[in-house]
């Protein structure tokens, strides 16, 4: 009888582990690179997966990588779950170097002088299968950081900075 309960407990633990598993698929639209990573939390993701994420989200204009806030990846998987679709994102922008940020500002693009992109704390994305206004609403409701809505450019900005919002 005890063995039966132990087996049931192990099965429940295994199911719980499976339920907490996060899968994130990113496609960088500047070059078409694609990456899929699976993790439970920041402590169990493989170091080479973190390196691959850093590379995929690099500033493609100057080919410079930067560490990304792991909270972004958790936030992206949570948003996809709430939208009821797989976490399959198209990435418009991840890390942005200070030099690139300054060039974009000088060219008249609407980028913040102290952009969270320069800190590796922001990402501009589209979530496949989730309407853009719904993705924005879910990100706003989560209250985990900044949310920018760019309907003309067709993306949502999410970051792990202070809670705030804006629109194109």
Report residues per predicted region.
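N-terminal export leaders
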Residues: 1-3
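Bacterial Sec-dependent signal peptides at the C-terminal "C-region" and cleavage site
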Residues: 8-20
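Near-N-terminal "mature-domain entry" segment
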Residues: 17-48
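Catalytic cores and adjacent binding grooves of peptidoglycan-active enzymes
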Residues: 22-27, 110-168
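Short, surface-exposed glycine/acidic/tryptophan-bearing loops
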Residues: 40-41, 47-48, 95-122
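Active-site acidic/histidine clusters and adjacent loop/turn architecture
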Residues: 41-90
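Sec/Tat-exported extracytoplasmic proteins
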Residues: 76-83, 87, 99, 129, ...
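A structural signal for short, well-ordered beta-strand segments and their strand-loop junctions
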Residues: 88-92, 148-149
């Amino acid at each position: 009888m005890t063995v039966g309960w132990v087996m049931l407990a192990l099965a429940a633990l295994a199911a719980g582990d499976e339920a907490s598993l996060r899968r994130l698929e990113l496609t960088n639209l500047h070059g078409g690179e694609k990456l899929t990573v699976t993790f439970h939390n920041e402590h169990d993701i493989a170091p080479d997966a973190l390196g691959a994420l850093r590379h995929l989200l690099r500033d493609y204009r100057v080919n410079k990588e930067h560490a990304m806030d792991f909270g972004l990846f958790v936030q992206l998987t949570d948003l996809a779950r709430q939208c009821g679709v797989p976490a399959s994102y198209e990435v418009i922008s991840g890390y942005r170097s200070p030099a690139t940020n300054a060039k974009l500002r000088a060219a008249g693009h609407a980028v913040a002088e102290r952009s969270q992109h320069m800190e590796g704390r922001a990402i501009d994305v589209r979530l496949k299968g989730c309407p853009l206004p719904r993705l924005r609403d879910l990100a706003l409701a989560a209250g985990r950081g900044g949310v920018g809505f760019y309907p003309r450019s067709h993306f949502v900005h999410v970051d792990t900075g202070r809670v705030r919002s804006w629109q194109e």
